[in-house]
Amino acid sequence: LSATAIESNLRQIYPVLMQGFKTAGLSVGTPFFIKYCRVGVMNDIGDLLTPDVLILLIGERPGLGRAESMSAYMAYRPQHGDNDANRDVVCNIFEGGGTNPLEAGAFIVQFAQKMRQNQASGVKLKLAAG
């Protein structure tokens, strides 16, 4: 997956996320880096750290045409056995043609709040939120 995507977008999106979570009264654990991870690692992280909401910033596959395209995968209380139906994603985050990183950061904060309010993510969130 594309490391260029993280390098290209993290400086813009990270401060928006941190400020947004602070303003919303949401606590944030220590961010960390996982080399060569895939989206399924969210289940392992969920089992170990038991967060209410987990957000994974990950570069899209370089073969998709834009090496700087990043996605934010999100899950409410992820755990072993969860699959894509239990997750939400904000994709195609990059400046100059994709979702602007600043706008994506604000949206991710709002979405995390929605997950906590409804205690759900993925298909369950869509059903709970109507």
Task: List PLM regions with ranges.
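C-terminal functional extensions of proteins
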Residues: P62-E68, Y73-G130
